[in-house]
Design a protein with these regions (language model features):
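Single conserved hydrophobic/aromatic residue that forms the stacking wall/gate
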Residues: 1-9
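Conserved ABC ATPase "signature" region
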Residues: 19, 72-91, 200-201
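A short, proline-enriched helix->beta-strand linker immediately N-terminal to the Walker B motif
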Residues: 115-119
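Helical segment within the ABC ATPase nucleotide-binding domain
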Residues: 136-149, 161
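A short, surface-exposed alpha-helical micro-motif characterized by mixed small hydrophobic
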Residues: 163-165
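ABC ATPase "signature
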Residues: 181-182
Length: 222
């Protein structure tokens, strides 16, 4: 491109047949937080430190469902906090972000993202700021949401072991371009592109074994 950004290609972001790059802003506002929700990688910076958790979880309802009463919003928020497996939802509801752990904050973000029952949940590196044990718990939670609610999940991650546990289809990107795409098993067991092969080869052997065992275990208990 003329500004040194490389070649410029025609781009589209299609959602149910509509190009989101060329639609009315009012249409986008209706989608955001309602049909499409996002969970970011650092919940502490995504949550407002001066508002209680309950108020923030309810925010999408105030925007997209103003017909609901305060009591109805609270009840739905408490239900979601319970569904994301937070103990003592009432206490979490009344808490401020700094009063709960990083893993709990990320579960809160997932609850807020799911409160309007979106068709698509974009999870942008949602486990990066968490320790390994909590990472695994969040991935299992996302998988259950996908299976029980039918919500499509776009999971963005550099951690291939987590990708393998959660995803059914994988798109490998390098420098903003698609290198390879296909079913999860095909990508991990028979990668075609050299870049993908190097990524797979870089996964520690113990992680590969554990990921495979976890996938089989989840399938057996699913």
């Amino acid at each position: 491109g003329s500004r040194g950004l490389g070649d410029v290609y025609k781009r589209q972001i299609l959602f149910e047949g509509t190009d989101l790059l060329h639609c009315e802003r009012s249409f986008l506002r209706e989608l955001q937080g309602n049909d499409i929700s996002v969970v970011f990688q650092e919940p502490m910076t995504s949550l407002n430190p001066v508002y209680r958790i309950g108020w923030q979880v309810e925010e999408p309802l105030r925007i997209h469902h103003p017909e609901l009463s305060a009591q109805e919003r609270k009840q739905r928020a408490l239900t979601l906090l319970k569904q994301v497996e937070l103990e003592d939802p009432e206490r979490i509801y009344q808490s401020y972000p700094h009063q709960i752990s990083g893993g709990q904050r990320q579960r809160v973000m997932i609850a807020a993202a799911m409160i309007c029952e979106p068709k698509l949940l974009i999870a942008d590196e949602p486990t990066t700021a968490l320790d390994v044990t909590v990472q695994a718990q969040i991935v299992k939670l996302l998988k259950r949401i996908n299976q029980k609610k039918g919500t499509a999940i776009l999971f963005i991650s550099h951690d291939l072991s987590l990708v393998r546990r959660l995803c059914s289809r994988v798109i490998v990107m390098k420098d903003g371009r698609i290198v390879e795409q296909g079913a999860m098993e095909d990508i991990f067991e028979n990668p075609q592109q050299e870049y993908t092969q190097k990524l797979i080869a870089a996964i520690p052997r113990c992680v590969k074994k554990n990921s495979g065992r976890s996938a089989k275990t989840e399938e057996a208990h699913g």
